[in-house]
Amino acid sequence: IVQADPAICGGYSEWKKIAAISTANNLKLAPHGGGNIGAHAVASLPQGLNVETYPGLRAAGAKVMKFFEIDEGDILLPNSPGLGLEIDWDAIK
């Protein structure tokens, strides 16, 4: 199982290159690190395995931004542009 982290391997574009190499070698992918970028990365792949999520971090982050929703273990990706992060600027102030 390949666990490249999109946040530290050079970004999403580099992660997709790693995914292509993994696909060519019939390897599963489970990106290291949770969050919206990992969820979108896994959703874009036929061999995507799972996405890490951290309930405590999600609860803390929920005070300033909206994350993807989880319903009975399934991630519900937003239809909004980009990664779907919505920052509550009033909460940050």
Q: Where in this protein do the model-derived segments appear?
A:
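Active-site microenvironment of metallo-dependent hydrolases
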Residues: 92-93
